[in-house]
């Protein structure tokens, strides 16, 4: 085999090696993208389940057994959170009990999802604006983190009385 054949053979081996490395890199990137997409889908499910759980509760501690005719009768913004003795979400009986609630939910291949909720009064006709006083609308914010994505995913839902 002459030196010309050796050079062509070597070039062919290098080209084939480059092709295999490129295909392997593309497959790895695709698998990583699929994994991240799957974890975001599961994060959506986890956040929605927390929102659904919160929506099943009374709007306010003062609306559990009676109607409220004035927003001034609702829990003050500084008092949002669980009442004395309510230490677990199974004991929560109204929406604002979930203010500053944190938990970890483990989902299959995607590991732990760290959940943090925040409840705020918002302007009735402008739910993006936080209110410093009681209103008939509360915004639920669910923040979800997971090791597979660098950012915190935030989900919002407004509930009104």
PLM region spans:
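Low-complexity, Gly/Pro-rich coil/beta segments used as flexible assembly/activation regions
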Residues: 41-161
């Amino acid at each position: 085999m002459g030196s010309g054949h050796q050079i062509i053979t070597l070039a062919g081996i290098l080209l084939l090696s480059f092709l295999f490395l490129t295909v392997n890199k593309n497959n790895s990137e695709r698998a990583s993208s699929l994994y991240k997409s799957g974890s975001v889908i599961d994060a959506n499910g986890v956040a929605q389940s927390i929102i659904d759980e919160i929506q099943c509760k009374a709007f306010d501690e003062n609306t559990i057994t009676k109607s409220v005719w004035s927003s001034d009768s609702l829990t003050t913004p500084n008092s949002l959170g669980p009442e004395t003795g309510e230490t677990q979400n199974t004991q929560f009986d109204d929406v604002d009990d979930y203010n500053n609630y944190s938990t970890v939910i483990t989902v299959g291949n995607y590991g732990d999802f760290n959940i943090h909720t925040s409840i705020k009064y918002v302007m009735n006709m402008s739910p993006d604006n936080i209110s410093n006083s009681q209103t008939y609308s509360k915004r639920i914010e669910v923040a979800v983190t997971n090791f597979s994505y660098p950012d915190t995913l935030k989900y919002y839902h407004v509930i009104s009385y």
